[in-house]
């Protein structure tokens, strides 16, 4: 969850104003080159912070302070960076480090700052008027499963006490051994007992373990891009890799450029099943197909009719890592109510160029997509074409709405934070 749940009572809004004293508002000045990124007409960007390290998700407090989850990488600082703009110029000039545990998902809820690490959910009590919490972290959930691959965890809250955490599957398509040419998938896939889904916990109860959670949705490979919006949980999933490498008799390198799609799902009820590892969504045929590990040849649907289809789909291998719905009014009307999605970018489209180093916008009408997506922010890779992912200058990782309706974007390469504003045409 990247913003506060809408629908607060007036009393709670007043309480938050005491916890987060507001700073002087100012129209920020954008960089001449938008900090190296490209935006639609009427938009511009400034670099609000830089050099933070491997920045993941971020969240803005009501007064404009921003909290950024920093991943644990060898030799890097880890924890949460708390950022404050003390003079209203749009750039953060005060920085404090909270904790020393790296994570991905981050949220502010009812006076607490939450962080999802690969194995836990932690929270700190916010101190009125202070940028940095004074006390130590409390453990909300511990013993979350992780086996290295797909360990990053996002957070979402339903506003009724429910805390939702993704548990990614440490696998490509449930083969044993994993990622081997011609090896069939395990059927049923045993990983789905403890991985490959969303688990629900009580946000108000400390000391929970994974065993205390309930599986809310399943059949999802990896999905740190989760958020609660308009009464439902929304997810953008990282789909399987290298379909041509492991099954060349059915799929070519050209097929791998477009298969499978990165799907967006809405969880309508507890127990929804989205079909991984048995099926994938085909971006060109617009339907679920059997994975080759389960007998698929790129045409057969088989058992896939029993699983929920996506509400939207994005090109193969773009790697969605964060999503937030826009509830502000600064941006033009067409953006209001839609979803901004941070894509980390592909690594396995060779021999074709890599792709998907962007922030994309998916328009919505109510709780349904209302048209084709548009690539909103580009230029993160720093070169076009990009052949090797390790040559990318930046990779979008987090998106969060500021109190004034501008949009923050984080970079996991060197820790740059962009603030995107609408100036008008």
What residue spans do the PLM features occupy?
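Beta-propeller domain segments
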Residues: 26-39, 152, 169-211, 218-222, ...
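Surface loop/turn motifs at the tips and blade-to-blade linkers of beta-strand repeat domains
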Residues: 48-52, 96-101, 140-147, 214-218, ...
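Conserved beta-propeller blade signature
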Residues: 65-69, 112-115, 162-166, 232-236, ...
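Short loop/turn segments immediately following the C-termini of beta-strands
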Residues: 71-73, 118-120, 126, 168-170, ...
